[in-house]
C-alpha cells in the first residue's frame, strides 16, 4: 500500500512538472535542458564598459594626441595606473578626464565572410579604447595627465578625445535559452567585426554590429546571436563538408544535401534552408552610435563567428 501511494505521488509530481514546462514554453515546444538550457548571463564590469572599443561613422579629430611621457624617448608605451603622460594640442581643462583611443587598421586584412568589407565601409572606422586619463597640469605648451584606467598600452600619436560617463549595465538573472527560436521580427543585423580583429568569439569578448540608435537600439539591450546553415553553405571552407559523401553502405536510399553530386542518391534531397536556425548566444549592448553598436558576449552555447546574425531579444 505504501509503495502504491509513493508511485501515485511521483506520477502526480511528474505530471505537474511537465504541465508547468509546457505552460512556460512557446506553442509547439517542450521545454527541456536540451532545447531550453539555463543561461547564466555575465554582468559587464567597469573595464568592459570603458575598454570595449567602437566603430564610428566619421573619423574622430586628431588635433589632440599623446606626445610622450616622463621617460620619452626611452619609453614609448604607457600603461601603469598613475603614470604621467604629455598631451599635445589645445583646450585641455585642469582636473578634466579624457579618453585615449586609437584609430585602427587590420594588418592581416581579409574578408572573413562574404560582404564584410562592404558592411565595414558603411559602418565606419574602428577604434580601440586605451585609457582614461585626468589632466593635472596645463602650465606648459603641453598638458600633463595621469592614467586613471588602463585598457592597453598608450603610444605617442594616440588620439585624446572627450570623456563621458557610462551607466552600469544592470544584473540580469539566469533564464532559459531557446536554442531554436524562429525570428521574432525585431531589429536585426550581423556581427561584422570584433575587438582585436578576432574571428572566433566567446563569453566576455566584444563585438561590433551594423545597427544602432537609428534602429532604436540602446545601451542595455540584449541581442540573440544565431546562425543558419545557409551561412556555412556559402562559406568557401565550411561548405566543403556539404560536398563530402553522406552515404553509408547499408542505406538503401541515401539522402543528399543540396543535390550533392558526390553522393549517388536515390533518396531525399535535404535543403539547408529548411533546417532550424540555431541560437548560439546572447550579447548585451555596451555603446551605440547612430549606425553601429558595441556589444559584449554574455552567454555562449558555442563559438560565435563574424557574420553571425543578431536579433533584438525582448527578454
Residue ranges of each PLM-predicted region?
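Bacterial N-terminal signal peptides
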Residues: 7-15
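Surface-exposed, polar/charged interaction patches used for macromolecular assembly or partner binding
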Residues: 2-5, 18-315
Amino acid at each position: 500500500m505504501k509503495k502504491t501511494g509513493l508511485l501515485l505521488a511521483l506520477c502526480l509530481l511528474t505530471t505537474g512538472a511537465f504541465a508547468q514546462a509546457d505552460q512556460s514554453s512557446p506553442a509547439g515546444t517542450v521545454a527541456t535542458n536540451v532545447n531550453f538550457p539555463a543561461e547564466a548571463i555575465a554582468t559587464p564590469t567597469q573595464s568592459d564598459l570603458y575598454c570595449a572599443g567602437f566603430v564610428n561613422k566619421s573619423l574622430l579629430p586628431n588635433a589632440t594626441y599623446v606626445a610622450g611621457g616622463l621617460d620619452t624617448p626611452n619609453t614609448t608605451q604607457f600603461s601603469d595606473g598613475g603614470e604621467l603622460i604629455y598631451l599635445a594640442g589645445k583646450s585641455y581643462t585642469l582636473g578634466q578626464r579624457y579618453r585615449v583611443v586609437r584609430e585602427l587598421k587590420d594588418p592581416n586584412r581579409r574578408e572573413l565572410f562574404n560582404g564584410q568589407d562592404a558592411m565595414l565601409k558603411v559602418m565606419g572606422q574602428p577604434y580601440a579604447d586605451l585609457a582614461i586619463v585626468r589632466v593635472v597640469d596645463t602650465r606648459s605648451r603641453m598638458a600633463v595627465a595621469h592614467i586613471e584606467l588602463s585598457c592597453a598600452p598608450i603610444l605617442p600619436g594616440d588620439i585624446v578625445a572627450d570623456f563621458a560617463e557610462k551607466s552600469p549595465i544592470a544584473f540580469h538573472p539566469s533564464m532559459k535559452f531557446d536554442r531554436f527560436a524562429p525570428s521574432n521580427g525585431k531589429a536585426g543585423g550581423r556581427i561584422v567585426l570584433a575587438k582585436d580583429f578576432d574571428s572566433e568569439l566567446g563569453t566576455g569578448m566584444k563585438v561590433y554590429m551594423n545597427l544602432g540608435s537609428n534602429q532604436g537600439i540602446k545601451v542595455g539591450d540584449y541581442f540573440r546571436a544565431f546562425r543558419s546553415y545557409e551561412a556555412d553553405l556559402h562559406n568557401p571552407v565550411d561548405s566543403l563538408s556539404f560536398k563530402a559523401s553522406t552515404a553509408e553502405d547499408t542505406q538503401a536510399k541515401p539522402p543528399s544535401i543540396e543535390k550533392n553530386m558526390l553522393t549517388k542518391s536515390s533518396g531525399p534531397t535535404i535543403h539547408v534552408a529548411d533546417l532550424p536556425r540555431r541560437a548560439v548566444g546572447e550579447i548585451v549592448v555596451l555603446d551605440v552610435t547612430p549606425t553601429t553598436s558595441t556589444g559584449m558576449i554574455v552567454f555562449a552555447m558555442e563559438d560565435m563567428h563574424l557574420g553571425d546574425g543578431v536579433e533584438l531579444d525582448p527578454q
